[in-house]
Structure formats: structure tokens, C-alpha cells
Amino acid sequence: HQEKKPITLYNYASSLLHLNADHYWLTEFSGEWAHEANMTERQLDFGKKIIDTKLGVRANMFCSPFFFLSLNQPARENEGDILMGTIGWTGNFRFTFEVDNLNGLRIISGINPHASEYSLKPKTVFSTPEFIFTYSTAGTGEATRNFHNWARKYQIKDGLADRMTLLNNWEATYFDFNEDKLIDLFGEAQKLGVDMFLLDDGWFANKYPRSGDHQGLGDWEETKDKLPNGI
């Protein structure tokens, strides 16, 4: 800005979209550890619907910064008009969906203004996080594939190139493993052409072996009963 003194920003959205349709159906995602991304779909009517969080760096723990908006019918996989959006921001966020008296819908996306005052010095630039969205006329399937293609092209390193594959033992064994079980995993993974193996939680501590999630953290030595020959 070009003022002589700093100015304070209190509310700074990334985007405003205005849509016109007969009906609007919103899908949001919520959850917790081991129960993530549960879908809830609801029809929007007159007034405001807000999806937001004030958990800071844990912002996506219970409330996902992502939504579908289906026009004129509930969201379907292979048909219908779908707007799918997210925000490139890992902190507090807010999406506001407001249906007005003429049945128009405004979608405002950005950083949550709660406790987000920002002092901007003279002759400096402030940029809001990107609101990333796609529009599909062929349902949620096309919209999600649009996001996949965007991520491969612009966000993931070497997203369009061949990448190495990795096997993690966690879902196969949890804490219950030994050398023989791991070697069996190696063999099956090798048949599939997997490049790397990652040994997950449960390999450390002897006095209080890491056989569950209530003991062993910090004792960084191989559990002899599980790995007698070490890692």
C-alpha cells in the first residue's frame, strides 16, 4: 500500500464467486483421527452456511478446507454441474455460502478473520492464499480428476514422471511384527516391483517395548524380541 503509516488488515478474503441456479447442494467433510473425511451433503436455502476452523496449525484435524457444490440436484459421480474448491492455506480458514433473497449464491473463501489481524507496512504487498477450484458438467468424477491433473502438473514434484514406490508395514502389521513377518512383506513387495520399504512404529524400546501407543517413545533402540539382529 502507499500510505505513510502501517495499516491493519482485519478481514481479507481470497475470492468471491457468485452463482445462479434453482437449487444448491453443499458437500462438506469432517472427522477425526482414524475417522477422517466423512461426507455430509445438505441443501442450501436462504441465509448463511459457514465452514470454518480456529484450530491454527491443526486446522484440518476436524474440518476439511474442501467442498463440493452441486447445482440443481444432489451431487452425482458422472452427471451434473459441480463446483469443487479448496484453499491453499494450512491455518485457520473460512468458507461462507450465502443465499440471498433472489436465490443467488455467494461463496467467500479465505483466511479466517478470527485473531488474524495483520499489520502491513508502507510500500509492501500482501497476497492472500490461492482459492483453487474447478467446474465440472459431468459430476464429481470429472471434478476430482481435474484436481488430480492440476496437482500432478503444478504441485507434486515430478508429478508426470515415473516415481519410486514404497511399502509401509503399518497397516499390514501395526505393532505386531517380527523379522519373519517383515521378510514375508519384502518378498511380496519385490514381486510387485516396489522400490523401498519403510519400517513404521513398533520397532524400538526394550524395558517398555513399543507394543502399543502408550509406551516406548524416546527409547531409540531396536526391540530385541522383534528384531534380534537389529535393523
Model segments located where?
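Glycine-centered helix-coil hinge/cap
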Residues: 31, 139-140, 156, 226-230
